[in-house]
Regions:
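A short, basic/aromatic helix-end/turn motif that makes direct DNA contacts
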Residues: 189-195, 315-321, 329-332
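DNA/chromatin major-groove-contacting recognition/catalytic segments
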Residues: 216-218, 307, 328-348
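Short amphipathic helical patch at the helix-1/turn junction of helix-turn-helix
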Residues: 97, 111, 177-179, 305-306
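Short, basic (Lys/Arg/His-rich) helix/loop patches that form interaction surfaces
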Residues: 161-170, 180, 235, 249-257, ...
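Short, surface-exposed polybasic/aromatic micro-patch for ligand or macromolecular engagement
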Residues: 1-33, 228
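Basic, Lys/Arg- and aromatic-enriched nucleic-acid-binding interface segment
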Residues: 107, 122, 126, 132-184, ...
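DNA breakage-rejoining catalytic core of tyrosine-based enzymes
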Residues: 80, 126-128, 139-161, 205-207, ...
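N-terminal core-binding DNA-recognition domain of tyrosine site-specific recombinases/integrases
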Residues: 8-11, 47-125, 266-268, 286-292
Length: 348
């Protein structure tokens, strides 16, 4: 309330203005009032909501980010006390200290933190996101050679020949990845009914992916979700791919999946990647080269680039909208082809 000495039209008007001003300040103060919460509780709240919005495999991956975030930031600090400079000091520690995380990984952590603090702003724990004005510190890193991402022709032959004689199921699976440029989860989750063989056209339909992250063998199954919208696609099969499909089906008679273990469960990524890693040197592959199931997808891209298939066609085939690795491999291969052409011209 407002009390003035006189009761006139002018003083009543003044009183009304003063009262409205007080109400406005009171409301502003109320809107600026934030609820106290410690950082670990905020992260827990955010992650609980996040897991309901994404695929379980994505949530499983992000769980690793969350673990590092809780090591970086004091879990008991009040969120309202966190500043941009505080965040910067924490990133400097994990990027340049014993942790020595890469810029790429730091970027994903920054993205996750920004989402967490945005949640805090929207739920009354913060008035401003401390990540908004934060830029990652620059870090000098060794540039990876593009050739590390795919197998050369001789390397591919060494791997496939070894797999064919040492593990038939893995050989068929890796051939399928290479011939069709599929992701592990797309190929491992592909059902026999997803492949269409006809006189007019042979193709496989990518309609989902294997949901495997953090699950036991009997819990793993295909879900009708893919990494991106572009991942939903039909992939044409050549004659060799059809042959691989037929052989794989003969080995998985007791399963609806094209590729399975002897017990009928889908092939697990950790099993096949461990096999590739442990047998790499016996295959004749350089011990420093990273060999995993994903390299066959990149090798498929490199082969299409060698065949001068346009980049946008390659991206559509492998289910990429705008993937830097695909583009880098393409440019590397086409540049190498141009250099080879120049040398051949000198022989004319």
């Amino acid at each position: 309330s407002v009390t003035l000495d006189k009761d006139t039209r002018i003083t009543r008007s003044q009183a009304q203005k003063i009262l409205l001003s007080k109400i406005s300040k009171s409301q502003q103060h109320a809107s600026n009032t934030i609820s106290p919460i410690v950082f670990s509780d905020l992260v827990s709240e955010w992650f609980q909501l996040y897991t309901k919005q994404v695929r379980s495999s994505t949530a499983y991956t992000v769980k690793g980010n969350v673990k590092l975030i809780l090591e970086m930031v004091d879990p008991d600090i009040l969120v309202s006390k966190i500043t941009t400079s505080y965040i910067r000091s924490k990133f400097e520690t994990v990027m340049f200290g014993d942790r020595n995380i890469s810029t790429t990984y730091a970027r994903s952590i920054r993205t996750r933190l920004k989402s967490i603090f945005q949640y805090a702003c929207e739920h009354g724990y913060l008035t401003e996101n401390p990540i908004n004005n934060f830029r990652l510190p620059k870090k000098k890193e060794n540039v990876k050679q593009i050739s590390e991402f795919f197998l050369e022709e001789d390397e591919l032959n060494k791997v496939m020949n070894y797999l064919e004689t040492h593990n038939t199921r893995y050989w068929l699976f890796c051939e399928w990845l290479y011939l069709n440029g599929l992701r592990y989860s797309e190929a491992a989750g592909m059902l026999k009914k997803d492949v269409i063989i006809s006189e007019d056209r042979n193709f496989c339909k990518v309609t989902g992916a294997l949901d495997y992250a953090g699950k036991k063998a009997d819990e793993i199954k295909k879900i009708n979700q893919t990494k991106t919208i572009a991942s939903l696609r039909e992939v044409d099969l050549n004659s060799k791919a059809v042959e691989i499909y037929t052989k794989a089906c003969d080995l998985s008679l007791n399963s609806e999946y094209i590729f399975s273990t002897s017990t009928g469960t889908p092939i697990h990524i950790s099993a096949i990647d461990t096999f590739l890693r442990e047998h790499k040197e016996r295959m004749g592959i350089d011990k420093n080269k990273k060999l995993s199931s994903h390299i066959f997808r990149h090798t498929h891209i490199s082969k299409l680039a060698e065949l001068e298939v346009p980049l946008h066609i390659i991206q559509r085939r492998v289910g990429h909208q705008n993937e830097s690795v695909t583009r880098d491999i393409y440019l590397h291969i086409t540049s190498r082809a141009k250099d080879k052409t120049k040398k051949l011209l000198e022989m004319i």
